[in-house]
């Protein structure tokens, strides 16, 4: 294998075939080391409804970063993949595909239709796995699961039966949300409330046996077909004389009573409220209090049923138009007032949801919610990142309603209940013995099976399953904040109920991917981006870097092609640095690198810049690891970027040229070893985020072996820490930067040699590194002393530990130099004010770590010294 890298980074070439090699090498499976601490993640199963979008790419990237880092740190890692059958969404997709050929699901019948859905599932599961491969996600495919697998189906049946036997699952007639397009019930959290334009229709009902009328207002006039009463408040003097009387519903002429109930608000509208118990949740409660009949006036498809008289068969919105016209003709439509109001829409089909009386299966939530709330005060509490989402979770659990779990679909887990002609019902994990039993045709809400995902995928209900014992509870769940209600909370209460444990220790919540303008990506806006298109142009590593580097727990991310360009440029920079190092250090062995590093640590070889970069590497490893452990991938990315781009590439690499272009071969070998070691460690730090190109370079390093996937993650090596070297080279870099800035201000190019004077208590050190100063600043004459006469006409700069003077007689204007220094003085004054404010904050001083407070005090001393020196220099110039 050649150690050379191609002249230009080409992600297509680098990524081609790499994923397949990893799979062949089985590097994604658990290590099987019984002494290693287990670390497990179950993938939030994507729906088999279509291709993955950018949000999925973000979600899986974050999980892959975590699992790759933990694998490198020696954990026994399991990342379990799988997919969700997504009942209503998948059934709707397949039905739409069949409709293109003029076929309805009913034309095929249940079994043949389900055959079509399984074909769809197989097609899109293959597509999803191909996309996972393009993203480079390191899941263990030998443990892949699907929510309709037999093992998971067994878990679903067991949970249903046990909850039923406890009385926590029941079948009853209640008001539910109904999707007329999918023709199924929906839970409250599957309803999205959108603000739309509507109208208040003011209608009069005639008092029976009187010429008097009462006026009501409604946004849904068609529902009067199901009215069974009108109510007024008993304190409302306007209507006391009508209580106990009846009204006659217009058109259909049904007679209904006038009752009193606190639900009627005297201050709202006319104070008279129509009651439609079968189509309004508040009206349902009123009807329960007064034992009113409940009239369902709508079919499953949203058309008016036989209770609608002449409107039978009309679509609900068509019926509304006709009823409004008829009421107008009767003179009983008083007014129509436009209103902007929130209306529930189906999360899946987008149609307006109808509250509707229906017989369904429900989960009683009281006890399950109480257990979940109580658990958050124990050692087994789930830790949310960021912590504010714990409050979101708790609020939902404290206000939860019974969960409607039956769906009028074919695709899903069929409810394990059977009925016979005698009206008996049997609930069990298996069908009852004997003939004459028919299984309930409804299926369970998709989220019912998804709620069992963390433990059903590990072999439960077999609690002796090796994976269940080893990897459950899982370590971390990564998911978006939009499904805390749908999924996270349900996994928690189901896991507590059936395993006695939380399903995961940590939950990392991320936000949504938005476009550059901050808009949510959607089909209607046409601003969606296919991650595969991005990968084709930039490569998976660049996309992963963007997704992680812009990532903070709980925050949204704005996609930007400019940021993608920056990500690609960063990889290209590392590629070029690696290419340079490999060209100059291709023959050095791992033993030689280790020996050289030992000498540098012992200070028997190497120079101050070698010890500086190794110290800075230690600091980077420590800070990156700390941020990764907190899931602050964006912060970790910034630390890595600054170290790699600025300290390693822009400074150390350039500083090494003083050695590499010299004559001392022994010193060159030391420098080569340090370059290789730092590159090796950088690649390991980057690998969890950008796996493809880091593997490509890693396998070409002469001092490494095996795959970077299972290489050891960097650790701090205290023997490399050298504070003096760190401070010294920091001063050197600050000095070189200051000279370059001064030259730029007076348009003096680096090619033009000018004299330089440096006054410093660290003159001995600066003289020792003077070859570097000369190489990077090109002085015609370099004077470094602890004390020296300051030239009158000179540009000056104050850096940490030194004063710098460039005599540029004839090139500078004293007034302009004073003005420049006064700007610098203002800068240091601002820095002093900020530090003084922080140190003046008693809470900060009392609560911050001692080393943090000391760091601020050190800053204060440094800034004060610079302020005083600049101020003195201004005074000198003004005197002259």
Swiss-Prot record:
The reaction(s) annotated as catalysed by this protein in its Swiss-Prot or TrEMBL entry are: tRNA(Val) + L-valine + ATP = L-valyl-tRNA(Val) + AMP + diphosphate
Q: What is its main location?
A: cytoplasm
From the record, which residues define motif 'HIGH' region?
46-56
Q: Which InterPro entries match?
A: aa-tRNA-synth_I_CS, aa-tRNA-synth_Ia, Anticodon_Ia_Val, M/V/L/I-tRNA-synth_anticd-bd, Rossmann-like_a/b/a_fold, tRNA-bd_arm, tRNAsynth_Ia_anticodon-bd, Val-tRNA_synth_C_sf
Q: Does the keyword Hydrolase apply?
A: no
This chain is encoded by the gene named: valS
Q: Which GO BP terms sit in this record?
A: valyl-tRNA aminoacylation
What's the protein name? Valine--tRNA ligase
Residues annotated for ATP binding in this entry = 523
Name the keywords, alphabetized. Aminoacyl-tRNA synthetase, ATP-binding, Coiled coil, Cytoplasm, Ligase, Nucleotide-binding, Protein biosynthesis
């Amino acid at each position: 294998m050649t150690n050379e890298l191609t002249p230009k980074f080409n992600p297509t070439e680098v990524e081609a075939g790499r994923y397949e090699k990893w799979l062949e090498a089985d590097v994604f499976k658990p290590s099987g080391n019984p002494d290693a601490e287990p670390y497990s993640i179950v993938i939030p199963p994507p729906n088999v409804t279509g291709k993955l979008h950018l949000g999925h790419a973000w979600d899986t990237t974050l999980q892959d970063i975590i699992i790759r880092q933990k694998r490198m740190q020696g954990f026994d890692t399991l990342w379990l993949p799988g997919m969700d059958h997504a009942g209503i969404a998948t059934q709707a997709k397949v039905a739409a595909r069949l409709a293109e050929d003029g076929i309805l699901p009913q034309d095929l019948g249940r079994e043949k239709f389900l055959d079509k859905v399984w074909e769809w599932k197989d097609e899109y599961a293959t597509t999803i796995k191909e996309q996972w491969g393009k993203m480079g996600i390191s899941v263990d495919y030998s443990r892949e699961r699907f929510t309709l697998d037999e093992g998971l189906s067994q878990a679903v049946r067991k949970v249903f039966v046990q909850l039923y036997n406890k009385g926590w699952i029941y079948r009853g007639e209640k008001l539910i949300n109904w999707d007329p397009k999918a023709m199924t019930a929906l839970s409250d959290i599957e309803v999205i409330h959108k603000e739309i334009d509507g109208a208040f229709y003011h209608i009069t009902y005639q008092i029976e046996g009187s010429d008097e009328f009462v006026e009501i207002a409604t946004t849904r006039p068609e529902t009067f077909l199901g009215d069974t009463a009108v109510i007024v408040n008993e304190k409302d003097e306007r209507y006391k004389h009508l209580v106990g009387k009846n009204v006659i519903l217009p058109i259909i002429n049904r007679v209904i009573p006038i009752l009193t109930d606190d639900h009627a608000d005297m201050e709202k509208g006319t104070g008279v409220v129509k009651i439609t118990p079968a189509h309004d949740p508040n009206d349902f409660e009123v009807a329960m209090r007064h034992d009113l009949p409940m009239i369902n006036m709508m079919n499953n498809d949203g058309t008016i049923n036989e209770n609608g008289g002449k409107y039978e068969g009309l679509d609900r919105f068509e019926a509304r138009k006709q009823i409004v016209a008829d009421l107008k003709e009767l003179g009983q439509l008083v007014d129509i007032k436009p209103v902007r109001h929130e209306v529930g829409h189906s999360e899946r089909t987008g149609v307006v949801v109808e509250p509707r009386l229906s017989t369904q299966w429900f989960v009683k939530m009281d006890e399950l919610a109480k257990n979940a709330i109580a658990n958050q005060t124990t050692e087994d509490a789930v830790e949310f990142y960021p912590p504010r989402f714990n409050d979101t979770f708790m609020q939902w659990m404290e206000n939860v309603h019974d969960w409607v779990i039956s769906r009028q679909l074919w695709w899903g887990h069929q409810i394990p209940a059977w009925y016979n002609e005698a009206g008996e019902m049997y609930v069990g994990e298996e069908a009852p013995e004997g003939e004459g039993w028919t299984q309930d045709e409804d299926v369970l809400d998709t989220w019912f099976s998804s709620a069992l995902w963390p433990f059903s995928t590990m072999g439960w209900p077999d609690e002796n399953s090796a994976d269940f014992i080893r990897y459950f509870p899982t370590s971390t769940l990564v998911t978006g904040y939009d499904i805390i209600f749908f999924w996270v909370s349900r996994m928690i209460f189901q896991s507590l109920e059936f395993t006695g444990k939380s399903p995961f220790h940590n939950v990392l919540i991320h936000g949504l991917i938005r476009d550059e303008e901050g808009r949510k990506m959607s089909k209607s806006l046409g601003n969606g981006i296919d991650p595969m298109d991005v990968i084709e142009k930039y490569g998976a590593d660049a996309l992963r870097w963007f997704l992680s580097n812009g990532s903070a727990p709980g925050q949204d991310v704005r996609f930007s092609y400019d940021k993608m360009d920056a990500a690609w440029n960063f990889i290209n920079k590392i590629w070029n640095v690696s290419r340079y190092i490999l060209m100059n250090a291709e023959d050095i062995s791992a033993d030689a690198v280790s020996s050289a590093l030992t000498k540098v640590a012992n200070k028997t070889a190497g120079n101050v810049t070698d010890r500086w970069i190794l110290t800075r590497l230690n600091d980077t490893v420590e800070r990156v690891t700390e941020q990764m452990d907190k899931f602050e991938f964006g912060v970790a990315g910034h630390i890595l970027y600054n170290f790699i781009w600025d300290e390693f590439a822009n400074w150390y690499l350039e500083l090494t040229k003083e050695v590499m272009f010299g004559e001392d071969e022994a010193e060159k070998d030391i420098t080569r070893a340090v370059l290789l070691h730092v590159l090796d460690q950088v690649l390991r730090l980057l690998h969890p985020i950008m796996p493809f190109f880091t593997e490509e370079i890693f396998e070409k390093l002469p001092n490494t072996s095996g795959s970077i996937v299972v290489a050891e993650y960097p650790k701090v090596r205290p023997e490399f820490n050298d504070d003096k070297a760190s401070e010294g080279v920091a001063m050197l870099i600050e000095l070189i930067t200051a000279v370059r800035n001064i030259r730029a201000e007076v348009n003096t190019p680096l090619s033009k040699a000018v004299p330089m004077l440096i006054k410093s208590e660290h003159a001995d050190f600066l003289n020792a590194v003077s070859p570097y100063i000369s190489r990077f600043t090109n002085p015609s004459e370099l004077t470094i002393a602890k004390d020296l006469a300051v030239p009158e006409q000179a540009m000056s700069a104050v850096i940490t530990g030194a004063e710098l003077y460039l005599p540029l007689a004839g090139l500078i204007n004293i007034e302009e130099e004073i003005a420049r220094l006064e700007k610098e003085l203002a800068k240091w004054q601002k820095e002093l004010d900020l530090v003084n404010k922080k140190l003046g904050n008693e809470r900060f001083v009392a609560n911050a770590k001692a080393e943090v407070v000391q760091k601020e005090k050190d800053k204060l001393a440094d800034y004060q010294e610079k302020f005083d020196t600049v101020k003195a220099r201004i005074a000198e110039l003004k005197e002259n």
